[in-house]
């Protein structure tokens, strides 16, 4: 079982307390399910992406959280602010990066991995 959370499930961010609280809850659920289901050989992990290039992030309301001094921020202006949050020189990750992490955790290669939050975050949790 793979639950999708967010980097905000492992780190606090200003102005989105409701989102941070919900994503931290996913971590608690994942750990509880890992303990409950482990004896049945069911693995449970969570994935914690940074910004992903989807409409959830690529919209004016969200971009203004990251570029508050620009009334109508462009994708390029948002990219600069977003990249500054990451250790790796990328502004966001692609949906396929999350899909690949899910495939790995669901595969036999991860057969002994359970109860683990896996960041797919371009280093945002390190900065």
Residue ranges with predicted function:
Residues 6:
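Residue(s) in the substrate-gating loop at a strand-loop-helix junction
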Residues 75, 86-98:
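A conserved structural motif in NAD(P)-dependent oxidoreductases
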Residues 11, 102-103, 114-127:
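Short C-terminal tail/terminal secondary-structure segment
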Residues 38, 43, 113-115:
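Short, small/polar-rich loop/turn modules that mediate ligand/substrate recognition or access, typified
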Residues 11-17, 39, 90, 108:
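Active-site loop immediately N-terminal to the catalytic Tyr-X3-Lys motif
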Residues 22, 30:
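Active-site helix of classical SDR
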Residues 43-53, 106, 119-121:
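Conserved SDR Rossmann-fold cofactor-binding beta-strand/turn motif
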Residues 49-59, 63-68:
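Short, flexible catalytic-loop segment of classical short-chain dehydrogenase/reductase
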